[in-house]
From Swiss-Prot:
Residues 124-149 form a coiled coil. InterPro entries: Boi1/Boi2-like, PH-like_dom_sf, PH_domain. One of its GO terms (cellular component) is recycling endosome. This is Sesquipedalian-2. It is found in: Early endosome; Recycling endosome; Golgi apparatus, trans-Golgi network; Cytoplasmic vesicle, Clathrin-coated vesicle. A motif (F&H) lies at residues 223-235.
């Protein structure tokens, strides 16, 4: 792998936030100068993304080494010196020796192993796939919940089947859906302007509820002319009786006036 040393050094010293940093002891890793003794070299390490930089000190202005954390695993290891909490960065490529490091304590060792194991793009791809799977499961679960909630709401709000049975009348007619008392009265009111007074009196609320052409007294009448004749006979009889009475009273008065 070829890197631009100036660009890499600028990135290592830039103000970009670091994922982890601290002192580690190293034993002759890639890019690290060997030490005369077996105690290793204590350096300041900075992790940015998948790049692990090492410096001579915390105030160092030039990185000593760079480890690209791709195609590798982080494992616990034995340090050459006792009482050291060591771990190794092992690469899959043949001929590349492990990079042996040691932390100052068990907590620091655990923290470094954790962050270095999660620094590669391969790990990020696994996390993204897992998150996508969880998101898909959550969407499917939400869709099922919405579907079940809509079904429950629809079952509660399901309209009842209308009763199509209508009560039949004697002449075979029945009330339509608009033949309610209010609708019939409104319909009669809209037509009352063209009707005569006698016709309006005959078509009262009781007759309107029965339907057109029907009478509460004589259901066999089927039209206005028949109804008019039927009531007219009674009126003619009453008129004849009244005329007879009037003629009788007039004749009595004439007899009383005679000497």
């Amino acid at each position: 792998m070829k890197l631009n040393e100036r660009s890499v050094a600028h990135y290592a010293l830039s103000d970009s936030p670091a994922d982890h940093m601290g002192f580690l002891r190293t034993w002759g890793g890639p890019g690290t100068p060997p030490t005369p003794s077996g105690t290793g070299r204590r350096c300041w390490f900075v992790l940015k993304g998948n790049l692990l930089f090492s410096f001579e000190s915390r105030e160092g202005r030039a990185p000593l080494s760079l480890v690209v954390l791709e195609g590798c695993t982080v494992e616990l290891a034995e340090a050459p010196v006792p009482e050291e909490f060591a771990f190794a960065i092992c690469f899959d490529a043949p001929g590349v020796r492990p990079h042996l490091l040691a932390a100052e304590g068990p907590a620091a060792q655990e923290a470094w192993v954790k962050v270095l194991s999660r620094a590669s793009f391969g790990y990020m791809r696994l996390v993204v796939r897992e998150l996508e799977s969880q998101l898909q499961d959550a969407r499917q679960s939400l869709a099922l919940q919405r579907r079940s909630s809509w079904k429950s709401v629809a079952s509660r709000c399901k309209p009842q089947a209308p009763n199509h049975r209508a009560a039949g009348l004697e002449n075979g007619h029945c009330l339509s859906k608009d033949s309610s008392p209010v609708g019939l009265v409104e319909e009669a009111g809209s037509r009352s302007a063209g009707w005569g007074l006698a016709e309006w009196e005959l078509q009262g609320p009781a007759s309107l509820l029965l339907g057109k052409g029907q009478s509460p007294v004589s259901p066999e009448t089927s039209c206005f002319s028949t109804l008019h004749d039927w009531y007219g006979q009674e009126i003619v009889e009453l008129r004849q009786c009244w005329q007879k009475r009037a003629q009788g009273s007039h004749s009595k008065c004439e007899e009383q006036d005679r000497p």
